Amino acid sequence: MSTYKIAVVVGSLRKDSFNRKLANAIVKLAPPEFSFKQVQIGDLPLYNQDDDDNQAESVKRLKNEIKGSDGLLFVTPEYNRSIPGVLKNAIDHASRPYGQNAWARKPAGVIGASIGVIGTAIAQQHLRNVLACLDVPTLGQPEAFIYVKDGLF
């Protein structure tokens, strides 16, 4: 049986993150032919195109982990009706320099959890738009917008 390596990108740095808990729950419930690795994004410098020719070690690590995966799982909160800056920063780093997009052609799932009544619906749509630009095919259905209440995790 083949094992599919999935890179998990959690768009939250919060210690008690709902989205990290959601990612952990997905990993526990997944079929055995999937292996998951959460990629670290909190140590990346802010993206600056001037650094494309001399990328930080943390950026090189991120790009290698993405390139070594068979697929992606993005688990994102929603901040002010969009994705968190830390997630966009990671996406920008791994897509650069031009022509060296580590995300390209990696199939992806998108999910998220929030205390807002619409969950992460708008953040997920924004993320899907960004990923489409980067040639990342995303699973269109089903969509899951998780409204977090006490006791969910």
Which residues are covered by each model-predicted region?
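N-terminal beta-loop-helix "entrance" segment that forms/cooperates
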Residues: I41-E57, F153
